[in-house]
């Protein structure tokens, strides 16, 4: 259907539209008109992706000079594939309506691991190994050697792409990862570099967060993208953690020992080259005097190690004299390594700021701040000069150099914590240095400054106002949308007591209480008797899940649950969890029914949708607070309090509630789906917790369902499931939660749509 969204003609590839989709498009258009940033919370399963794509594509066509590109960032490969399929549907609808092929290019980009087609590289399991092997086949000096001697190993796909692929752009159309690989095999071109080259002239690019937020990768991949692009971060409720992880470095004793070995290898290589080819080292010295920008004007294949965060002015400077020659630089790294090793020999926890660390470094081993800033780039230049083909071996030393560059670049927003042992095993010495980023805005700031519109969107962003604070930006639109339903298909409830009236909670004091554990077991047992097909239960941590399940086993509760449904458990091993998920789905398909016990913040809670019968009930055992004794977390809370005036308790509750909402939101993946959302902890009933749930869940959480016993909860569930079992046809939704074009244009509907979005 063709829609008129605030004067913009939008092609929508379906015959019907949800009211919230139209409302969402209106907000999006306002954001794009204002050329600003937006934060939008849209209920899960209401067609967020297609609304985004349809509106932004229409905007691109109407104002080609205003918006040149859409950069769509998603978290996992399956999500990226989903977005590409929606885009394909949308483009074919456009072509059907217009009767001609559009000059439109949309593509997905992922790591070499998902795109490489070289027979020697594809069998490797880990991304790091794939990148290293790729570099050893495509580095410019490896290719130069191949030109001289064609018997040497090389990558024929890259050579072919380099000769022909750059002249012939990708034909217009939509490409997912498999399509790119198919083109690569057909033409004999490397799909990874083809995709990286093509994103410059694509209309829509879909890739992972890291390509924009991790400075080491963004510098290589996204540097050339134009300012007039719209960036969308989908499923962005965790975006602050992604930003923080991309800027933090952990150094253990094992890493430092491997650094030592790396340095010795480099020392030998330098001596060998000095004897055979001294000209090469002189050439590098000359380049470094001219400035790093010249030194790093290397080819795309060599840019395997990007610098973590160097501002432009540093790249234009000459490298300090003290680290220009290879021997001096290696001596410099050795002194730095010895100092960090010495710091790890502490007997108690140390916390200090980067300037304090630097002053200690200057006093002890006479290392100044300036050469440290060049460390990462200088190492990159050295590895390039020495023609080191297997870069993965040097990742420990690269990590140390990145740490040196970061610690000398940022005086604020970071802390250094040195722990002599893990709190959980205080008798085992296991020292670790955390260089921890506390300010999420540091990684995302360049994105906000560079692109004219950045949209942060997800099903669980409540409370909205905290995101602009912790990411330090000023949105032009902030809105949360409700879910218009012809029948109420979600049933949230808070179970706060067992049948014996004992308050149930996962808080630390009552965690080991046998009565609480028994009541949790009874809740699962009774729910498994009334809920059809699949139940997903989330615990607050792996440790808590293990101790609870062990206790249920001793009390015989597990045996009773097994009579109703089969049990599957998520573990920390990814492969094991995948098998458990597969079997869980099989049990639901076969009508045996299944329960999946998993962990908030784990793999299951983030990326897996339990559509229809795979998730008829989600039970959240406890409030999923993060481990509050962690020193890194304490330092971050202190920073948030001092810099952004966010109280510790507010942030912890916000963090717990967004994860709880993310977990229970897995059950509802569309308006024809239905499910129970059980919050099993009396603390959820408090106003400060309840008020931080997304608006679309809060609306259906009635006062009657706030502090139920297990029995009462089961009665509510029975009644709800009986209602849901009644036949439900598309006709029942028409005019209410599903609109045709005529209905959408009526004044009454438009008035209703205005109430869906709640602006903040």
Swiss-Prot record:
Keywords: 4Fe-4S, ATP-binding, Chromosome partition, Cytoplasm, Cytoskeleton, DNA damage, DNA repair, DNA-binding, Helicase, Hydrolase, Iron, Iron-sulfur, Isomerase, Magnesium, Metal-binding, Nucleotide-binding, Nucleus, Transcription, Transcription regulation, Ubl conjugation
Top-level lineage group: Eukaryota
Enzyme class: isomerase
Localisation per UniProt entry: Nucleus; Cytoplasm, Cytoskeleton, Spindle
Motif Nuclear localization signal, residue range(s) on this chain: 682-695
Binding site for ATP: 42-49
A single GO molecular function term of this UniProt record: ATP hydrolysis activity
GO CC annotations on file: CAK-ERCC2 complex; cytoplasm; MMXD complex; nucleus; spindle; transcription factor TFIIH holo complex
EC number: 5.6.2.3
Annotated InterPro entries: ATP-dep_Helicase_C (IPR006555), DinG/Rad3-like (IPR045028), DNA/RNA_helicase_DEAH_CS (IPR002464), HBB (IPR010643), Helic_SF1/SF2_ATP-bd_DinG/Rad3 (IPR014013), Helicase-like_DEXD_c2 (IPR006554), P-loop_NTPase (IPR027417), RAD3-like_helicase_DEAD (IPR010614)
Primary location group: nucleus
Free-text description of this protein's post-translational modifications in UniProt: ISGylated.
A GO BP annotation: regulation of mitotic cell cycle phase transition
Reaction(s) catalysed (UniProt annotation): Couples ATP hydrolysis with the unwinding of duplex DNA at the replication fork by translocating in the 5'-3' direction. This creates two antiparallel DNA single strands (ssDNA). The leading ssDNA polymer is the template for DNA polymerase III holoenzyme which synthesizes a continuous strand; ATP + H2O = ADP + phosphate + H(+)
Family label: Belongs to the helicase family. RAD3/XPD subfamily.
Known role: ATP-dependent 5'-3' DNA helicase, component of the general transcription and DNA repair factor IIH (TFIIH) core complex, which is involved in general and transcription-coupled nucleotide excision repair (NER) of damaged DNA and, when complexed to CDK-activating kinase (CAK), involved in transcription by RNA polymerase II. In NER, TFIIH acts by opening DNA around the lesion to allow the excision of the damaged oligonucleotide and its replacement by a new DNA fragment. The ATP-dependent helicase activity of XPD/ERCC2 is required for DNA opening.
UniProt-recorded name of the protein: General transcription and DNA repair factor IIH helicase subunit XPD
Gene expressing this chain: ERCC2
């Amino acid at each position: 259907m063709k829609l008129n969204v605030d004067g913009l003609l939008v092609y929508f590839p379906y015959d019907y539209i949800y009211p919230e989709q139209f409302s969402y498009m209106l907000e999006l258009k306002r954001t794009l008109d204002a050329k600003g940033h937006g934060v939008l919370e849209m209920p899960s399963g209401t067609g967020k992706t297609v609304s985004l794509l349809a509106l932004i594509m229409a905007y691109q066509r109407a104002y080609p000079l205003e918006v040149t590109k859409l950069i769509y960032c998603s978290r996992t490969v399956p999500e990226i594939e989903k977005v590409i399929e929606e885009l394909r549907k949308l483009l074919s609808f456009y072509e059907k309506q217009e009767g001609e092929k559009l000059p439109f290019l949309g593509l997905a980009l992922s790591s070499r691991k998902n795109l490489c087609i070289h027979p020697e590289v594809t069998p490797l399991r880990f991304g790091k190994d794939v990148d290293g092997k790729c570099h050893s086949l495509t580095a410019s000096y490896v290719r130069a050697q191949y030109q001289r001697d064609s018997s040497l190993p090389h990558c024929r796909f890259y050579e072919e792409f380099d000769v022909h692929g750059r002249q012939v752009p990708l034909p217009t159309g939509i490409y997912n990862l498999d399509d790119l690989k198919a083109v690569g095999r057909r033409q004999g071109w490397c799909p990874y570099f083809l995709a990286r080259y093509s994103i410059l002239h694509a209309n829509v690019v879909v890739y992972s967060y890291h390509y924009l937020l991790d400075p080491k990768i963004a510098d290589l991949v996204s540097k050339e993208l134009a300012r007039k692009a719209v960036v969308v971060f989908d499923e962005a409720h965790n975006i602050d953690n992604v930003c923080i992880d991309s800027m933090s470095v952990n150094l253990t004793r094992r890493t430092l020992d491997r650094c030592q070995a790396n340095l010795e290898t480099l020392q030998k290589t330098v001596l060998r080259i000095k004897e055979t080819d001294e000209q090469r080292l002189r050439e590098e010295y000359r380049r470094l005097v001219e400035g790093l920008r010249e030194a790093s004007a290397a080819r795309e294949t060599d840019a395997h190690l990007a610098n973590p965060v160097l501002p432009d002015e540093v790249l234009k400077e000459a490298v300090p004299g003290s680290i220009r020659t290879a021997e001096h630089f290696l001596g410099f790294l050795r002194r730095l390594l010895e100092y960090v090793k010495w710091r790890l020999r502490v007997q108690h926890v140390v916390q200090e700021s980067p300037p304090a660390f630097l002053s200690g470094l200057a006093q002890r081993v006479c290392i100044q701040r300036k050469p440290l800033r060049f460390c990462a780039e200088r190492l990159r230049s050295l590895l390039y000069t020495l023609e080191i083909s297997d870069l993965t071996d040097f990742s420990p030393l690269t990590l140390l150099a990145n740490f040196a560059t970061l610690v000398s670049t940022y005086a604020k927003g970071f802390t250094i914590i040195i722990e002599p042992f893990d709190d959980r095993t205080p008798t085992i010495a296991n020292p670790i240095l955390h260089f921890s980023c506390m300010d999420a805005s540091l990684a995302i700031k360049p994105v906000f400054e560079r692109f004219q519109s950045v949209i942060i969107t997800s099903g669980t962003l409540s409370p909205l106002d905290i995101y602009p604070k912790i990411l330090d930006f000023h949105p032009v639109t902030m809105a949360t949308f409700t879910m218009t339903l012809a029948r109420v298909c979600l049933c949230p409830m808070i179970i706060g007591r067992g049948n014996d009236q004992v308050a149930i909670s996962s808080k630390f004091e009552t965690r080991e209480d046998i009565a609480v554990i028994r009541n949790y077991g009874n809740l699962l047992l009774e729910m498994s008797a009334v809920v059809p097909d699949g139940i997903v239960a989330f615990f607050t941590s792996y440790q808590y899940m293990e101790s609870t399940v062990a206790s249920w086993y001793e009390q015989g509760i597990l045996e009773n649950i097994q009579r109703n449904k089969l049990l599957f458990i998520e573990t920390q091993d990814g492969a094991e969890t995948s098998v458990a998920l597969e079997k869980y789905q099989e049990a639901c398909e076969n009508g045996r029914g299944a329960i999946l016990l998993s962990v908030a913040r784990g793999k299951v809670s983030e990326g897996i949708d339990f559509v229809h019968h795979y998730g008829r009930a989600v039970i959240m055992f406890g409030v999923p607070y993060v481990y509050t004794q962690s020193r890194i977390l304490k330092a971050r809370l202190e920073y948030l309090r001092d810099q952004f005036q966010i109280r510790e308790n507010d942030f912890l509750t916000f963090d717990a509630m967004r994860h709880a909402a993310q977990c229970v939101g897995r059950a509802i993946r569309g308006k024809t789906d239905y499910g129970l959302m059980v919050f099993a902890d009396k603390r959820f009933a408090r106003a400060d917790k309840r008020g931080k749930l997304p608006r679309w869940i809060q609306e259906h959480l009635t006062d009657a369902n706030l502090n139920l016993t297990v029995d009462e909860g089961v009665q509510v569930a029975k009644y709800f499931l009986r209602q849901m079992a009644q036949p439900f046809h598309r006709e029942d939704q028409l005019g209410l939660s599903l609109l045709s074009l005529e209905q959408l244009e009526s004044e009454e509907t438009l008035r209703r749509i205005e109430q869906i979005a709640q602006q903040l």
